[in-house]
């Protein structure tokens, strides 16, 4: 199989990279009616597979799970989760031939094997859905021409997909139709109905392309979503301990601080996150972020270049073929870092303290979000896609670190995200180590010694304007506004 993106000419590549629009609520007035009465079979019963299935069943759809015969015979976790929740479970051979819609919610690395296994079993004119387009775009999977190929990708972990649905809402969702596989021209209608059944239309749906989703998703997860957070944790912990901060306190300040700081980011963007700092701390965080961007910009550009060219996918798939030798070694090395093995602390840390003593963390998040967003847009990815794959998802990943540090993050994210995270981290740590070592203890762990909030007014105005007047802040305010409006509409219905 050849890389699908690289098989297109430049005009086709740019057209698909730039495909993304926020869909109007009126486009979902028929809900999931288009696929009611269909036999819908889910492959995979992990967090996304189970929780999407629960939502779709509650929306009135007919859901069953196809598992490998050995998983059923041995009553593995996937079988237990599906049966405990009252779903019909069968083998591929039993369920796939009757399926109108097959949802491939297995891990990325398994997609080629899974699709090649189920495709001969699928009936004429059936539909195959992905939640991530890597198999189509990077591996170049060619699906039978009579099969419609769509993508429905909730931009949140599976557990949140379920919890938001139970609250009467949903999570932002990206949908797409593979242009090579839309034989009846109804792929978009199927994707819309599927997204509605999971609750996605209540939070906002982006109509995108397989290519835009893959290239932006890979870039976001490698850089700001995982790589920058891991780099911040490893270097930040080293710095604080070297400065004499008690190890348990240092680990907690980072582990819980990343989540607390990014919650402010989630609610009101970079502007709100920076506004949580005192005036002197805000100016310092702004200056640090600019310095960090200067150091890291070439690394962000290299990751984007390797993602666009397919070089990243080529090297990762070579590691797949080598039984994940690099991935497993890097995972083990990460688990041996000082931050991962730091003692826990029961010391209470006030919410504001995470900002006051975490100026460096704020600067890293600001620099990472802006670099990831701007680098994606410069590569031809539309702003809406770039926002959802940078700022929007950062708090979700920080939440995993808050639970069980970097181990939890790397367990929850996809195999492609974990591999890319390690690549970025291995380059970023040496780039930033001297910078972090040389910075004042006031910026991480200590807090500013001067309690005065006094600053030069002209400089503060300049900094505030620079923070607010960026493309990621403009599009973020617009998209968060859409989500709030839709939540109000959902609550009123």
From Swiss-Prot:
Keyword Isomerase belongs to the record: no
Binding-site list for Mg(2+) 1: 217, 221
Keyword field: Amino-acid biosynthesis, Branched-chain amino acid biosynthesis, Magnesium, Metal-binding, NADP, Oxidoreductase, Repeat
SUPFAM superfamilies: 6-phosphogluconate dehydrogenase C-terminal domain-like (SSF48179), NAD(P)-binding Rossmann-fold domains (SSF51735)
Pathway the protein acts in: Amino-acid biosynthesis; L-isoleucine biosynthesis; L-isoleucine from 2-oxobutanoate: step 2/4; Amino-acid biosynthesis; L-valine biosynthesis; L-valine from pyruvate: step 2/4
Catalytic site: 132
GO biological process: isoleucine biosynthetic process; L-valine biosynthetic process
Cofactors: Mg(2+)
Reactions it catalyzes: (2R)-2,3-dihydroxy-3-methylbutanoate + NADP(+) = (2S)-2-acetolactate + NADPH + H(+); (2R,3R)-2,3-dihydroxy-3-methylpentanoate + NADP(+) = (S)-2-ethyl-2-hydroxy-3-oxobutanoate + NADPH + H(+)
EC number: 1.1.1.86
Domain KARI N-terminal Rossmann, residue spans: 17-208
Molecular function GO labels: ketol-acid reductoisomerase activity; magnesium ion binding
Source species, domain of life: Bacteria
List of residues binding NADP(+): 45-48, 68, 76, 78, 108-110, 158
Annotated cofactor note: Binds 2 magnesium ions per subunit.
Binding residue positions for substrate: 414
InterPro entries: 6-PGluconate_DH-like_C_sf (IPR008927), 6PGD_dom2 (IPR013328), KARI (IPR013023), KARI_C (IPR000506), KARI_N (IPR013116), NAD(P)-bd_dom_sf (IPR036291)
Positions with a binding annotation for Mg(2+) 2: 217, 389, 393
Chain ranges of the KARI C-terminal knotted domain: 209-344, 345-486
Role of this protein: Involved in the biosynthesis of branched-chain amino acids (BCAA). Catalyzes an alkyl-migration followed by a ketol-acid reduction of (S)-2-acetolactate (S2AL) to yield (R)-2,3-dihydroxy-isovalerate. In the isomerase reaction, S2AL is rearranged via a Mg-dependent methyl migration to produce 3-hydroxy-3-methyl-2-ketobutyrate (HMKB). In the reductase reaction, this 2-ketoacid undergoes a metal-dependent reduction by NADPH to yield (R)-2,3-dihydroxy-isovalerate.
Family: Belongs to the ketol-acid reductoisomerase family.
Name of the protein this chain belongs to: Ketol-acid reductoisomerase (NADP(+))
Organism: Shewanella amazonensis (strain ATCC BAA-1098 / SB2B)
């Amino acid at each position: 199989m050849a890389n699908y993106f690289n098989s297109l000419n430049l005009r086709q590549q740019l057209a698909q990279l730039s495909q993304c629009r926020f869909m109007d609520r009126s486009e979902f007035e028929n809900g999931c009616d288009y696929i009611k009465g269909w036999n819908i079979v889910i492959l995979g019963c992990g967090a996304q597979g189970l929780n999407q299935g629960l939502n779709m069943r509650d929306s009135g759809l007919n859901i069953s799970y196809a598992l490998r015969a050995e998983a059923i015979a041995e009553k593995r976790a996937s079988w237990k989760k599906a049966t405990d929740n009252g779903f019909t479970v069968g083998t591929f051979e039993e369920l796939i031939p009757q399926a109108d819609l097959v949802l491939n919610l297995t891990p990325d690395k398994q997609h080629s094997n899974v699709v090649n296994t189920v495709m001969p079993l699928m009936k004429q004119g059936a539909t195959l859905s992905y939640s991530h387009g890597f198999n189509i775009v990077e591996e170049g999977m060619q699906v039978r021409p009579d099969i419609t190929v769509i993508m429905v990708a909730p931009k949140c972990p599976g557990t949140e997909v379920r919890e938001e649905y139970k609250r009467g809402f949903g999570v932002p969702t990206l949908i797409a139709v593979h242009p090579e596989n839309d034989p009846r021209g109804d792929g978009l209608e199927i994707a819309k109905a599927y997204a509605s059944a999971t609750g996605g239309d209540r939070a906002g749906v982006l109509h995108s392309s397989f290519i835009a989703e893959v290239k932006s998703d890979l870039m976001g997860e490698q850089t700001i979503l995982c790589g920058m957070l891991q780099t911040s944790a490893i270097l930040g912990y080293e710095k604080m301990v070297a400065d004499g901060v008690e190890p348990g306190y240092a680990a907690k300040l980072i582990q819980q601080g990343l989540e607390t700081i990014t919650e402010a980011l989630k609610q009101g963007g970079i502007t709100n996150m920076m506004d949580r700092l005192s005036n002197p701390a805000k100016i310092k965080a702004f200056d640090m972020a600019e310095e960090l961007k200067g150091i890291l910009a070439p690394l962000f550009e290299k990751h984007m270049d390797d993602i666009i060219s397919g070089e990243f996918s080529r090297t990762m798939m070579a590691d797949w073929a080598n039984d994940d030798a690099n991935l497993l070694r890097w995972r083990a090395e990460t688990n041996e870092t000082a931050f991962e093995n730091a003692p826990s602390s029961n010391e209470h840390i006030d919410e504001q303290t995470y900002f006051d003593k975490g100026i460096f963390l704020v600067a890293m998040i600001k620099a990472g979000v802006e670099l990831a967003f701007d680098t994606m847009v410069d590569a031809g990815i539309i702003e809406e896609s770039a926002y959802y794959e940078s700022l929007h998802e950062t708090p979700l990943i920080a939440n995993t670190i808050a639970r069980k540090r970097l181990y939890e993050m790397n367990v929850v994210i996809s195999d492609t995200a974990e591999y890319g995270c390690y690549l970025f981290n291995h380059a970023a740590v040496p780039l930033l180590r001297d910078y972090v070592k040389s910075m004042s203890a006031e910026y991480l762990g200590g807090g500013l010694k001067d309690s005065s909030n006094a600053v030069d007014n002209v400089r503060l105005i300049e900094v505030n304007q620079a923070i607010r007047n960026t493309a990621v802040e403009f599009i973020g305010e617009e998209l968060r506004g859409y989500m709030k409006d839709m939540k109000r509409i959902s609550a009123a219905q």
